[in-house]
Design a protein with these regions (language model features):
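Hydrophobic anchor at the beta1->P-loop junction of P-loop NTPases
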Residues: 23
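Conserved lysine of the Walker
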Residues: 31
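Interdomain motor-coupling "hinge/lid" segment immediately C-terminal to the ATP-binding subdomain
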Residues: 118-120, 124-227, 260-263
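Catalytic cores of nucleic-acid endonucleases
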Residues: 323-324, 347-391
Length: 399
């Protein structure tokens, strides 16, 4: 089992803190394995095995349904003394009312509770009712490039060679653990995607027109890294002779977001210092999702470079926005408490244009500014703007 230190360090920070730790992310991103890592770590730290209760609540195991009371009782029966019990509860969203059971265990027993889940039922409004102020949400993503390199050890290829593979095959752990060609890797990812779409969206929300839903998904995938609106999608469908209300498009976007398939990136007005509500971008939970749906094409690489940088910033705890500086756009403004960085992303620096650098130089503050590129020869510093190769940026500890 390959350790993912970022998540283990976070879980150690919150160990024995009276909060429910909720690990949430797309299916197969590694949440269950993180619970296994946690169990091993607890054992190494001297916790008795019979005081670590691991429960898995998959739909296959509980197809007939389980009540919150049965969930509570099933766990409580295993707690045979007054010592502290560590509860590792996997895929709890399959239990209706799990929040009530977990809240009761938090209040009425000596417990430290960790749960995982992969869809909107995990983050339902019931959490606000039963767990307000009593949980911490820990987002789990597919592998970062640094984690991908760990998964590939002892591969003799250089980081930049492995970056090309990471760009094409993505970061789902199951893919990284194998030696798959593109076709096989995309078949695996397609299986994950179909499972998410079927189990977390179309069945749950009773979507009848599957073809129309798929067309909306395809539009989003085709437009990763571009600003658009629900209204734009509705108009596009109308131009194809299909009819879907703007409200329905909003619902589709919302459901995809709650299943952790897409992530919304809002615009931030650098002049007015405010978040704008229009013309957002959406990024995919993993670059491989685009390729399993659309196939790999070299022209799509720039958008997926953005996708990878966006998630690297999120993994590091930044709130990430698109920057609007009057009429100019900055790919990313990443904010963390009182700190921020600005990032432009391009495949290579244009020889006859300084747009990427010039847009950053127009921002009159002293926060770090980066242009991230695949250009091997472009590394350097232009008037304080750092030009960095993508591999170096993803592995850097300077931001």
């Amino acid at each position: 089992m390959i350790i993912r230190p970022q998540y283990m360090n976070t879980l150690k920070t919150y160990r024995d803190v009276p909060l429910v730790k909720i690990l949430a992310g797309i299916r197969r991103c590694g949440k269950s394995t993180i619970l296994d890592m946690l169990r091993d770590d607890l054992l190494k730290s001297g916790i008795a095995a019979d005081h670590i209760l691991s429960m898995r609540y998959t739909s296959e195991d509980f197809d007939g349904g389980m009540t919150d009371k049965a969930m509570y009782q099933g766990i409580k029966e295993q707690m045979t003394d007054d010592g502290r019990y560590y509860l590792l509860l996997d895929e709890v969203q399959e239990i209706d009312g799990w929040e009530k059971a977990v809240n009761s265990l938090l209040e009425n027993a000596n417990t430290d509770i960790y749960v995982t889940g992969s869809n909107s039922k995990l983050m339902s409004s019931e959490i606000s009712t039963y767990l307000t102020g009593r949980y911490i949400s820990i987002p789990v993503y597919t592998l970062s490039f640094a984690e991908y390199l760990d998964f590939k050890k002892p591969d003799s290829r250089s980081p930049k060679e492995l970056l090309n593979e990471y760009l094409r095959l993505g970061g789902f752990p199951i893919v990284a653990l194998g030696s798959f060609d593109e076709r096989s890797a995309y078949q695996i990812v397609e299986g994950i995607y179909n499972s998410v779409i079927t189990n977390d969206i179309t069945k749950r929300h009773n979507i009848m027109n599957f073809d129309l839903f798929n067309r909306v998904v395809k539009y989003i995938v085709e437009n990763v890294g571009k600003t658009f609106s629900a209204n734009a999608i509705a108009k596009f469908l109308k131009s194809e002779g299909r009819s879907l209300s703007v409200e329905a498009v909003y619902n589709y976007l919302n459901w995809l977001e709650k299943a952790f398939v897409i992530y919304r990136c809002q615009r931030y007005d650098l002049q007015g210092k405010s978040v704008l509500k229009t013309q957002e971008k959406f990024y995919l939970a993993d670059a491989s999702l685009k390729y399993c749906i659309m196939g790999f094409h070299p022209t799509s690489i720039v958008a997926m470079l953005e996708n990878i940088v966006y998630f690297e910033l999120r993994r590091r705890g930044y709130e990430v926005y698109i920057g609007k500086n009057e009429t100019k756009e900055i790919d990313f403004v990443a904010v963390q408490r009182d700190e921020r960085i600005y990032v432009q992303v391009c495949r290579r620096l244009p020889e006859e244009s300084d747009r990427e650098v010039a847009n950053l130089l127009e921002i009159k503050d002293h926060y770090p500014k980066y242009v991230v590129t695949l250009d091997e020869l472009a590394a350097g510093n232009i008037n304080g703007v750092k030009i960095v190769h993508l591999a170096d940026f993803l592995l850097s500890n300077l931001y």
